[in-house]
């Protein structure tokens, strides 16, 4: 997003179109897209099979606000591929999914704190905009104006791949930790592979 350019010493540019792994900006430059919409464009931009499926879906209607059979099919596919998943809830964004997961963890455990890892981004959730990357790390302080410090204080942040720091957090705050949230491959902190174990 435009707001991130200041953290990488770059000037924002605007995309006019994209196809495959290439984007064309508003100035007509043809560029390689190394970002891929932060994940959703894993098949590249505008692949014909995806465009065809979208056109078929749009021909049936643009939105309903209530469940459709295709959502049931998708949920069944998820639970078939991942047998440990017992329930699936459809939401509109990753931010909403994260918010729902945190609320569920806090509601189920009765605990308040969430443990996350430096540089991991979990959507635009106020309590998780702490050490989210794309700039200098903050320790227990919000990364964004308008996020109350109290929200950030409910988020514990430890270095990625540091099992000892996780243990220490649980020794100190374990009775109040509702959940750990982790981005398997942090996108805002360089590219760190998770260590085994």
Label the model's feature ranges.
Residues 1-17:
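Active-site-adjacent loop/helix segments that line or gate small-molecule/cofactor pockets in enzymes
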Residues 12-33:
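Active-site and channel-lining beta-strand-loop segments
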Residues 30-112:
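Glycine-rich loop-to-alpha-helix module at the N-terminal edge of alpha/beta enzyme cores
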Residues 32-35, 179-185:
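Short beta-strands and strand-loop turn motifs
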Residues 55-59, 145-153, 181-186:
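Gly-rich Lys/Arg/Thr-decorated short loops/hinges at beta-loop-alpha junctions or inter-strand turns
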Residues 65-66, 92, 157, 189-193:
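Alpha-helix capping and helix-loop boundary segments enriched in small/acidic/polar residues
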Residues 76-178:
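PLP-dependent aspartate aminotransferase-fold enzymes
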Residues 165-169, 185-197:
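Active-site core of PLP-dependent enzymes with the aminotransferase class I/II
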């Amino acid at each position: 997003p435009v707001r991130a350019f200041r953290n990488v010493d770059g000037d924002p540019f605007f995309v006019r179109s994209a196809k495959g792994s290439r984007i064309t900006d508003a100035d007509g430059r043809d560029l390689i897209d190394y970002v891929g919409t932060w994940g959703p464009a894993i098949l590249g931009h505008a692949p014909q099979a995806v465009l065809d499926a979208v056109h078929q879906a749009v021909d049936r209607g643009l939105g309903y606000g209530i469940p459709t059979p295709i959502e049931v099919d998708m949920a069944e596919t998820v639970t078939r591929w991942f047998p440990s998943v017992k329930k699936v809830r459809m939401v509109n964004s990753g931010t909403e999914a994260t918010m729902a997961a945190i609320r569920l963890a806090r509601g189920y455990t009765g605990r308040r704190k969430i443990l996350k890892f430096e540089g991991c981004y979990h959507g635009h959730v106020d309590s998780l905009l702490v050490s989210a990357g794309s700039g200098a790390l903050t320790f227990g302080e919000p990364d964004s104006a308008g996020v109350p410090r109290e929200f950030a204080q409910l988020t514990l942040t430890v270095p990625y791949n540091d099992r000892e720091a996780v243990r220490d957090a649980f020794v100190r705050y374990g009775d109040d930790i509702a959940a750990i949230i982790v981005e398997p491959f942090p996108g805002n902190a360089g590219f760190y592979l998770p260590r085994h174990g």
